[in-house]
């Protein structure tokens, strides 16, 4: 069996792992591709310490982002209901539908915080009334907001 070499990835490589991972690869792969193109570095004790420090910083930053998402979720809950005005035809049927972009604009107007419309899931809304939309604020944090559609 061929000897394997341990290297530390300096950027994400699709078949191996992400930045900072220690992986074992064939010597030729490391020597001819990973090392010359700067995608990896040889494993040394100092590099391992750098990786540990970097991972600790990333973990702290991720916890901070998660806490901000939780705080924003509570802010949305205290606001309670967002109102969206749309034109209505006869029989209370809307011209068009209420989209996730409309919900994002209503939330941004009330909270002054940008939300990506792709993170909002809105049911099909074709009538006036109250509805619930789901917002993914973080990988582990979701919120539900009440939407009232008026004319």
UniProtKB/Swiss-Prot annotation:
GO biological process: translation
Xref: PROSITE patterns: RIBOSOMAL_L9 (PS00651)
Keyword Ligase: no
SUPFAM superfamilies in alphabetical order: L9 N-domain-like, Ribosomal protein L9 C-domain
GO MF annotation: an example: structural constituent of ribosome
InterPro entries, sorted: Ribosomal_bL9 (IPR000244), Ribosomal_bL9/RNase_H1_N (IPR009027), Ribosomal_bL9_bac/chp (IPR020594), Ribosomal_bL9_C (IPR020069), Ribosomal_bL9_C_sf (IPR036791), Ribosomal_bL9_N (IPR020070), Ribosomal_bL9_N_sf (IPR036935)
Keywords from the named record: Ribonucleoprotein, Ribosomal protein, RNA-binding, rRNA-binding
Gene3D superfamilies: Ribosomal protein L9, C-terminal domain, Ribosomal protein L9, N-terminal domain
Assigned GO CC terms: ribonucleoprotein complex; ribosome
Family membership: Belongs to the bacterial ribosomal protein bL9 family.
Function of the molecule: Binds to the 23S rRNA.
Protein's name in the database: Large ribosomal subunit protein bL9
Species whose genome carries this gene: Prochlorococcus marinus subsp. pastoris (strain CCMP1986 / NIES-2087 / MED4)
Taxonomic placement: Bacteria, Bacillati, Cyanobacteriota, Cyanophyceae, Synechococcales
Gene for this chain: rplI
